[in-house]
Regions:
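Short amphipathic alpha-helix that is part of the acyltransferase structural core
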Residues: 2-46, 64, 162-197
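Active-site rim helix/loop that mediates acceptor-substrate recognition in acyltransferases
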Residues: 32-66, 197-218, 222-229, 234
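Conserved beta-strand-loop-alpha-helix junction that forms the acyl-donor binding cleft
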Residues: 117-130, 141-147
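Glycine-rich phosphate/pyrophosphate-binding loop shared by adenosine-nucleotide-utilizing enzymes
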Residues: 68-74
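Short hydrophobic/aromatic beta-strand element in the GNAT-like acyltransferase core
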Residues: 58-62, 74, 84
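Conserved hydrophobic beta-strand within the GNAT/NAT acetyltransferase core sheet
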Residues: 82-85, 116-120
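Conserved acetyl-CoA binding element of GNAT-fold acetyltransferases
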Residues: 78-90
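Conserved acetyl-CoA-binding loop-helix of GNAT-fold acetyltransferases
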Residues: 93-106
Length: 261
């Protein structure tokens, strides 16, 4: 009979993504230096001061390998600004980069930040970011910037009158030129509630990085074909109507009635 006293495999912890700790920094520096000396493509040792500052500011995320307990990837920028994502060479091709991106997406969603932006560095990373759903911004400065708009759906209340909503975003020149084509036109369904608020079934967003020439973007809202407002998003009057600022642009979840004067 086979022995029942075979040694059990050692249990290993699960790999985790978390904020960096002091003990993570030396191992990261060590493998960055080793890969830089070996000429590994896509090494960010040259940005060490940026990485160290992100750690100090508690903005550095690390992927801790469950078997070794060591950091084998890191990310800074949280996909809300140009940042860095690097995976240790011998851990590439295992989906770690994809997991780091998904983690950052969830962080952004929890903060109600649906407009993501990155810089694809090195340029060989462009296919990866495109697979992650990012779109390159033509002629961007710095080059190879890319953006992504996360979808956010809302459950409409049972009460209220169904309405059709169209939101348009224009460049600043719409303020003085009527014959100006909208940069973005998006439609949504909604419910007009007893208090006059119109709740949309999805978030309507405008990503500033995707349209750098828009300058002070102008927003127009129509409900059942009737214009509700058209003006610069930054104006207080529009923000009272539901135009909301986020890190990388603007969004509308609901249209509020005009305040009585």
């Amino acid at each position: 009979m086979p022995s029942t006293n075979q040694p059990k495999a050692l249990a290993t912890s699960r790999s985790v993504i978390r904020r960096s700790k002091a003990e993570d920094i030396a191992p990261i520096r060590s493998w960055l230096e080793a890969e830089d000396a070996a000429g590994v493509h896509g090494n960010f040792l040259c940005n060490w001061s940026v990485i160290a500052r992100a750690h100090k500011d508690q903005e550095l995320l690390v992927y801790i390998d469950g078997k070794t307990g060591l950091p084998v990837a890191f990310q800074l920028g949280r996909l809300l600004q140009s940042g860095i994502l690097q995976v240790k060479q011998d851990f590439r091709g295992r989906g770690i980069g994809k997991k780091m991106v998904a983690y950052c997406v969830n962080l952004a969603r929890r903060k109600s930040e649906d407009l993501l932006v990155i810089q694809c560095k090195p340029s060989s990373s462009i296919p990866f970011w495109q697979r992650m759903g990012f779109t390159l911004i033509p002629d961007s400065d710095p080059p190879n910037k890319a953006y992504k708009v996360l979808e956010r759906r809302h459950d409409l209340p049972a009460v209220g009158k169904p309405v059709d909503v169209v939101i348009r975003f224009y460049p600043e020149e719409r303020k003085w030129r009527d014959a100006c084509t909208a940069l973005v036109q998006l439609a949504a369904s909604g419910k007009e509630l007893p208090d006059g608020v119109i709740q949309l079934d999805r978030r309507i967003s405008f990503h500033e990085d995707a349209y750098p020439l828009a300058r002070d973007v102008v927003v127009e809202a129509e409900v059942n074909g009737v214009r509700q407002f058209i003006d610069k998003a930054k104006y207080r009057e529009l923000q009272q109507r539901g135009v909301t600022r986020c890190r990388n642009g603007w969004f509308i979840d609901q249209i509020r009635p005009e305040e009585s004067r």
